[in-house]
């Protein structure tokens, strides 16, 4: 059966701010304590979604989470009214307040790992929510992520949304950001590649930054998603590039259908892995960027590989890049030479995602790829699918509710909490989500 890839982008939330919460993410650390613009972040995200929809790609939206997360603060011993909880946290533990106020759920490449029905034993689309165990501010996302995904993929005949793995380091799981799928056509059986940073059994690990994904987690996700072991591969990301700021594999590699676009140093034992992929994937097409042309540091600084690789009607592919890639002379020179070479990628499109990029999230971070056939796409909650009307509606919603300036000091303002709840309550009606947030229950 024919199928297509549908991109679901995370919408930046009302508390988008720069707190430097993500050790190992160099952009996050570099912009710590700068003043953010949540309204601009959301509008940039919506413009990205609208751009893809206008190009003919199926595009959906995943709503933000409620932040600050008052229940998380109560679990950590703060008490009283919501305003009192915020005041106590701001005075006693401002870093915790920042963590429970993070808008990091916008990077939905970390929301779940998705496997299409053609690869799953029961013929359903499987989505396993990521536990994001390595960072506290992200580990609290899983329950709301599961609720949102079940409100979008709500037909159990077609979809199976699995809860996150146990919240322990052994099963550290970062979702689709460490997962690639290869196939001749979207509707044909594929080969799934899970990328991990470390394994309990041993082997080398990064020395400076944490390896967020474990092999044990990847294997568990493959089991939950009911994958064929013969069509499932596991590969370790090179620990040296993790220490260089490649905290997820999607910062150093991106795939689409039979094509893998990656850096020469993305994987441990890379030549052997490429040979295995060539054996497993008919027509495997490797676009490997040499280290001598683009260093790992420049790849991280520009998010060259944290891009979206999209199939076109002419059989070629379009690469969606952040503005930072165009501003780097060496990276842009390599890209323009590649396109001029009449290879697989014949078009580049640059988007301004500055607000997200300053926190270390590029085009690929903001989207969750879901391969759907026609029946499955018809079963998706239609209210979340991007079109002219929804774009105008959501832009108006952002203009009404979002602040255009936010510092860490603002997180203690009870009015910000009220503004967020009012906005999300309205959004659940606009997107026909039901009562997915705790404050609504």
UniProtKB/Swiss-Prot annotation:
HAMAP family in the cross-refs: AstB
| Entry keyword annotation includes Hydrolase | yes
According to its UniProt entry, the function of this protein is described as: Catalyzes the hydrolysis of N(2)-succinylarginine into N(2)-succinylornithine, ammonia and CO(2).
Which InterPro entries is this protein grouped with? AstB_sf, SuccinylArg_d-Hdrlase_AstB
Describe which pathway this protein belongs to, using the record's wording.
Answer: Amino-acid degradation; L-arginine degradation via AST pathway; L-glutamate and succinate from L-arginine: step 2/5
Enumerate the Pfam families for this protein. Answer: AstB
Q: What is its EC number?
A: 3.5.3.23
For molecular function, the Gene Ontology terms on record are: N-succinylarginine dihydrolase activity
Sorted alphabetically, the keyword list is: Arginine metabolism, Hydrolase
SUPFAM superfamilies cross-referenced by the UniProt entry? Pentein
**Stated family:** Belongs to the succinylarginine dihydrolase family.
Q: Which domain of life is it from?
A: Bacteria
The organism named in the record is Erwinia tasmaniensis (strain DSM 17950 / CFBP 7177 / CIP 109463 / NCPPB 4357 / Et1/99)
Residues forming the catalytic site: 174, 248, 365
Q: Membrane-spanning residues where?
A: none
- What's an example Gene Ontology biological process for this entry? arginine catabolic process to succinate
- Write down what this protein is called: N-succinylarginine dihydrolase
